[in-house]
Design a protein with these regions (language model features):
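Conserved PLP phosphate-binding loop immediately N-terminal to the Schiff-base lysine helix
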Residues: 1-23
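Structural detector of well-ordered beta-strand residues that form the stable sheet scaffold
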Residues: 3, 33-35, 122, 155-157
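Nucleotide-sugar donor-binding loop of glycosyltransferases
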Residues: 6, 38, 160
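Short, conserved catalytic or adaptor-binding loops enriched in Gly and charged residues
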Residues: 23-27, 112-114, 148
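Conserved core segment of the aminotransferase class I/II
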Residues: 26, 30-102, 109-111
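Conserved glycine-rich beta-strand-loop-beta hairpin in the small C-terminal domain of fold type I
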Residues: 80, 84, 100-109, 121-134, ...
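Conserved C-terminal alpha-helix-loop-beta "cap" of PLP-dependent enzymes
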Residues: 119-120, 132-170
Length: 170
């Protein structure tokens, strides 16, 4: 079973397109649980609503049974209505949000290039989260965290939390 968190799927940049895991083949769809939500796209996190797509009927039945047993069978009606309204009427919101985010990404890119030239921003293909490469500074994880938290007064997520390939990134 593959649980695919596709909460950032509404955010792609340039010519990039998001392909849902389940759309890649019938075999993939048969083993997939796809999770999306309007929380990132439409700023609705407080309404605690998400979408879970399970094409496989047997898997969907097992999931529903587990959800019911855990006591989560009730739907947040306000969240459900907001989710539906957001996807039905929110295209202009999303268009404006993406323009705003593009400007933010451009600002970070220029700031790093002009003021922090040893750092590199990885150009995002999707999402509004940015990967900043700190490896050229030659710092240990502890030194980098000290620099970021105590000298720059920033709170960033260490790339190491995503595994060895994320080490040196924030």
């Amino acid at each position: 079973i593959v649980v695919s968190d596709e909460i950032h799927s509404d955010f792609t940049w340039g010519e990039n397109k998001h392909l849902m895991f389940a759309s890649l083949s019938d075999d993939f769809a048969d083993i997939s649980i796809t999770c999306t939500a309007p929380s990132k796209t439409f700023n609705l996190a407080g309404l605690q609503v998400s979408n879970i797509f399970i094409p496989n009927e047997t898997l969907r039945f097992k999931f529903k049974k587990a959800v019911d047993a855990a006591g989560y069978s009730q739907v947040n009606v306000m969240g459900l209505e907001a989710c539906q309204a957001a996807y039905e009427y929110g295209e202009e919101w999303l268009t404006q949000l993406k323009e705003y985010l593009k400007d933010n990404i451009a600002f970070v890119r220029e700031f790093i290039q002009t003021r922090l030239p040893k750092l590199t921003m990885i150009e995002p293909e999707g999402t509004y989260l940015l990967w900043i490469d700190f490896r050229a500074l030659g710092l240990t994880e502890a030194q980098r965290q000290d620099l970021i938290e105590n000298k720059a007064n920033l709170w960033l997520d260490s790339g190491a939390m995503f595994g060895p390939d994320g080490e040196g990134f924030e």
